[in-house]
Amino acid sequence: MGELTLVPKVTSRPLDTGSWGRSTTITGIAHRGNTVVTSGTKPGGTEDAPETSRKVPAGAGLRSWWPVAVPLVVVLIGAWTYRWVDEDAFINFRIVHNLLAGHGPVFNVGERVEVSSDPLWMFTLAVLHTVFPVSLEWTSVLLGLVCTAGGFLAGGFAVARLGARHDEGTVLPLGLLMVSVVAGVWEFATSGLEMSMVFLWLGCSFLLLVRVEARRAGALPAAVVAGLGTLIRPELVLGAGVVVAALVVVVAAPGWGIEKSRRWRCSGVVAAALALPVVYELFRMAYFAMLVPSTALAKAATSSWWSEGGTYLWNFVSPYTLWLPLALGAVIVAVRATAWWRTGDRLGVLVLCTPLLVGLVDLLYVVEVGGDYMHARLLLPAFFAVALPMYVGVRSLRGALVFPSIGIAVWSVVCLGWLRFTPPPIAGLTPQTVFISNERDSWVSATGTAHPVTATDYGRALSGRAGTLLARMARHVPPGHQELLVITNPFAPIDPSATRPARSTLPFTLAVNLPAIGVIGYLAGPDVYVYDSYSLANPIGSHTTVARHARPGHEKLVGPSWMLARFGVPGTTTAPGGPSTVTVAAARLALGCDPLAAYLHAITGSLTLSRAVANLGNSVSFTTMRFSPDPAVAAVQLCGPQVARP
């Protein structure tokens, strides 16, 4: 098949550089071998869909892709060198085990609370663990490497296509090189968390947008992929919206067939993007009786804390001097966007800048909510996105592009060899202390292994040993009995003799309150009900109000009084230093009043069709329900001021 070329004919008017289409007034004849394809304006104002919108030399993309191998190899070597699984990943592992055991995608058996905020990642792990005889821990590590590689390849192919269409020669993906040398990226390329899938989604979304704009086809599959972002991380709904908006602008441009169908094309893109997220949202409402994951409520994801968010941003930028390569990369993008704009390539500029907009909206959200307690983690999507369009072509490497390109290359070498994040020492640590940690280094130290991946590795840490002890305690509970363990000092060893009788319709043998639920919960097993003191997996605590800002993700700290009120046997004593009987009585009163009582019934009762339908209708009120973490205050709020305080 011959190479596609465009032979311009006489135009009826000068090129309109202000339109969003490319050379829409030029009528051309496309030659491919002995075949002639015409494109242009028909009488009546309709247009033929052109075979292609830009000259792309055959094989140009293949010839220019090889520089992607450099950042790809660097990031994979770094990720493997830093391979590990974060303690939080074991939350998903426990959910996967419960799912595969037939209990549903839940953290505590018998209680439908959505603790996983990354359902696509979690379900992918479940499928792979079912198909391949590999432990969940190593499945997550290997999947992370594959997704990271896929994200880098997709992003590299995207800029290679852009460079080939503009005849820039071999493309140097400086932005991907910039990302590949940052140690924070290496840590979360594995980690067992969903960040690698975010890289894959960003790279594929950019690549598909480039292909759609170039080929004037394939918009619906691209929209479906864009919509998947919300199933990887909730806040990616912002970036997904930007990508879908860009797709709508592209399909609304001339060159897509009959003009009268423009509205249907745009509607189709939006519908395709929303299809899977809407289906899952309906499932979430019917199954979990909520509009958002429990983790979103527990982390107060709608509250503002700009000052801490700024601190979190600087904590990521400063150790690697990221402001320097990002500023240089911005110059590269600005020079290219300006040149394309002047030639009338408005859609090309839109495609080029879409990843920048995705990164900026994600960055603003993360900073607005106060960031995270893990160094770099929540800023990596924005970093990867804004770096995607930062590239240079060998033929265009002149003038204003030379200095920024050399600067990024030199910085990359320095960052690769020397720039690392070292957290400052923390004095007087309390559960409410605000600090940003290097989670990998912390767990390397706690487990005594260079690569903490498996449950066996974590079993060497205090939390791992505690989980193993709880599993053993649960096995020794007499058949038909339930026990309750109240931990008043999370830093003290667990006392197996401190258990008290419990009663509940939930199928557990031992219930315990814990400040960390990942490794402990995973090793404790499904027979242990984990009452999460920080509310991620706590259907009561996640709906409490935030008294004051604390460490991001750890603001809703609730005491064991709610657990005693829900599962304890009235009249039994509690552990020394535990909540008073008055406080427990107030919590028990609050638990009996709607909407809290109705919500707990909705997520613990049998999931019949009628209950699923009722959950759909009640999910809004259940999601917006809030009350004080203080049981005495909550009793008045939930039961009404006419109820006397106990």
What is the meaning of each model-derived region?
Residues 1-60, 64, 642-646:
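Short, intrinsically disordered terminal tails adjacent to the first/last structured region
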Residues 39-44, 51-646:
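Membrane-proximal envelope and lipid/glycan-remodeling enzymes
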